[in-house]
């Protein structure tokens, strides 16, 4: 599981995935959400701008396998 450090209390889901290098742009998150390939704390997420807090775990189901990111405070 890759840890993504943030220096604020929250981060939006699309921003986190951009920061992690999982997507090239925030807009690239939309089709992944529509296909229910993004889970937040084990639950399928539909909101691109979902606010994440330290401790949240984001799972991204890609063709090459699953990637997991944990939000941690910097």
Residue ranges and their predicted role:
Residues 11-54:
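A basic, amphipathic helix-loop patch mediating RNA/tRNA/ribosome contacts
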Residues 1-11:
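A detector for short, charged/polar N-terminal pre-domain segments
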